[in-house]
């Protein structure tokens, strides 16, 4: 099943690793699955298939994609923010599928940043951040592979990361867990924004943008493509269940 998903859709082939046995994909239950399964959008649409396939429903070219908007404060970081800075290894024992540990995981998001970052992403003693949009430079999410990295950002309350480029494993984990939108900017937005700026991210096929209301500047973002519906659904397993690609948890 996983192999057919990958061959049918190039984006999924970058976000889903095939298991050794076909049956293991259907029975595997990741600790990184969101516990609030009701978060799957009611207007969920399967990925657009470039070729005829019974596994996908082709969306009409005339049918507009729903615009998704995130509005809030920005938290700005630089280049090469690695996963140790996003969530230090000492907190990897927390299990995101446990609601209490999921919330606690969010309180440690970006706690590994150096002291040069005077403003904490999550204030000491708080469980959530006041920053809903993270703006970074090149190679965001580099370092060791850990699903906790995008999960902790989503648990803290972040909705999107806008960076000049990503480490591929962080991008894949962001899509697979469905926690945050990893969006690519066409210019170095991190050099023109400041932590605390008020911004809006608008996602729509072909014309995604970031608007910095504090400076009045607007930046074009690269389309996230077919990865968008997977994140909307809450991750790759929630997406596959919703699309009927694997049995639902209740089956």
UniProtKB/Swiss-Prot annotation:
Entries under CDD domains matching the protein: IPMI_Swivel
EC number: 4.2.1.33
Tissue and organ expression note: Expressed at low levels in roots, root tips, at the basis of the hypocotyls, and in emerging leaves. In young seedlings, expressed in cotyledon epidermal cells. In hypocotyls, expressed in peripheral cells. In seedling roots, expressed in the epidermis, including root hairs, and throughout the cortex. In rosette leaves, expressed in the upper and lower epidermis. In roots of adult plants, expressed in the root tips and cortex of the mature root enclosing the stele. In flowering stalks, expressed in the epidermis. Expressed in the carpel epidermis.
Key words of the record: Amino-acid biosynthesis, Branched-chain amino acid biosynthesis, Chloroplast, Leucine biosynthesis, Lyase, Plastid, Transit peptide
Localization, UniProt: Plastid, Chloroplast stroma; Plastid
Reported consequences of knocking out the gene: Embryonic lethality when homozygous.
Predominant place of localization: plastid
Presence of keyword Isomerase: no
UniProt subunit comment: Heterodimer of the large LEUC/IIL1 subunit and the small LEUD (SSU1, SSU2 or SSU3) subunits.
Function: Catalyzes the isomerization between 2-isopropylmalate and 3-isopropylmalate, via the formation of 2-isopropylmaleate. Plays an essential role in leucine biosynthesis. Functions in both the biosynthesis of leucine, and in the methionine chain elongation pathway of aliphatic glucosinolate formation. Plays an essential role in female gametophyte development.
Protein name in UniProt: 3-isopropylmalate dehydratase small subunit 1
UniProt source species: Arabidopsis thaliana (Mouse-ear cress)
């Amino acid at each position: 099943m996983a192999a057919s998903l990958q061959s049918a859709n190039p984006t999924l082939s970058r976000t889903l690793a095939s298991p050794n046995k076909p049956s293991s994909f259907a029975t595997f239950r990741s600790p990184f699955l969101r516990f609030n399964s009701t978060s799957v959008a009611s207007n969920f649409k399967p990925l657009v298939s470039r070729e005829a396939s019974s596994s996908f429903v082709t969306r009409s070219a005339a049918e507009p994609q729903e615009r998704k908007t995130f509005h809030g404060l920005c938290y700005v970081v630089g280049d090469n923010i690695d996963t140790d800075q996003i969530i230090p290894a000492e907190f990897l024992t927390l299990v995101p599928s446990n609601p209490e540990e999921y919330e606690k995981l969010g309180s440690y998001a970006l706690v590994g940043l150096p002291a040069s970052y005077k403003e904490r992403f999550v204030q000491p003693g708080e469980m959530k951040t006041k920053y809903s949009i993270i703006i970074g430079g090149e190679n965001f999410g580099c370092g060791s592979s850990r699903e906790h990295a995008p999960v902790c950002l989503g648990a803290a309350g972040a909705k999107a990361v806008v960076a000049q480029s990503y480490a591929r494993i962080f991008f894949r984990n962001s899509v697979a867990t469905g926690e945050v939108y990893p969006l690519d900017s066409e210019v170095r937005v991190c050099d023109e924004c400041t932590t605390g700026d008020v911004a809006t991210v608008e996602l729509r096929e072909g014309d995604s943008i970031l608007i910095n209301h504090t400076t009045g500047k607007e930046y074009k973002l690269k389309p996230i493509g077919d990865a968008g519906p997977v994140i909307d659904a809450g991750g790759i397993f929630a997406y596959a269940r919703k699309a009927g690609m694997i049995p639902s948890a209740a089956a």
